[in-house]
Amino acid sequence: QQVIWSKVATDLVDNQELKRWAYERKQNDVGRVVSNFGGFQSSDILPKDNSQIDILVEHLDKEVNWCSQQVGLPEMQITNIWLNINPPGSYNHLHNHVGAVFSGVYYVHGEENQGNIQFERMDGAESFLPEYVAKQTYYSASRATYPCKTNGLYIFPGWLKHSVQGNQSNIDRISISFNYETKS
């Protein structure tokens, strides 16, 4: 079974301010290409780069450490956080976050047709399931898809392969991604 925590975090941060800052950051940051095709992925955001990001990180620290506690792991600390702007047609290919215990994404702006996040279990477990498991569930499925939506927060194991479907709208999808490791 896949382990993905999700919630809608309304009124957590000022998304309008984050959108404004995202486009400003894009103008002043060469960015990087990791899993993004056609989109912008910023360099790492540092503490005090943006007050709304700092507020978000405080919240993420609590959420990730709650998840860590649920699965019997020690306290976690953020290792990096970055901005994604995915215009129409862009997507993120299948990847994982090497070295991260937990990873996640917060949607500053996300709506229908902007590309859902997909998690893939590539262990072949479905071939061991009995033939009578006709209906796919989170237990039996090799892929789980979660909607792209404003204020959506997803936290998952860093080793879990995932991708983001292509943005089929005419509006940019804006998200903040992050990684956590064991606190030193």
Segments from the language model and where they lie:
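Catalytic core of non-heme Fe(II) oxygenases with the double-stranded beta-helix
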Residues: N86-I155, T182
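Residue-level detector of short, conserved catalytic/binding motifs and their immediate flanks
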Residues: I81, F102, I174
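A short coil-to-beta-strand element that immediately follows conserved catalytic motifs
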Residues: G72-I81
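Non-heme Fe(II)/2-oxoglutarate
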Residues: Q1-L73, R173, Y180-S184
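Short beta-strand His + acidic residue motifs that chelate non-heme Fe in jelly-roll/DSBH
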Residues: N92-H95, H162-S169
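Preference for bulky hydrophobic residues occupying beta-strand positions
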Residues: S6, L83, Y106, F178-Y180
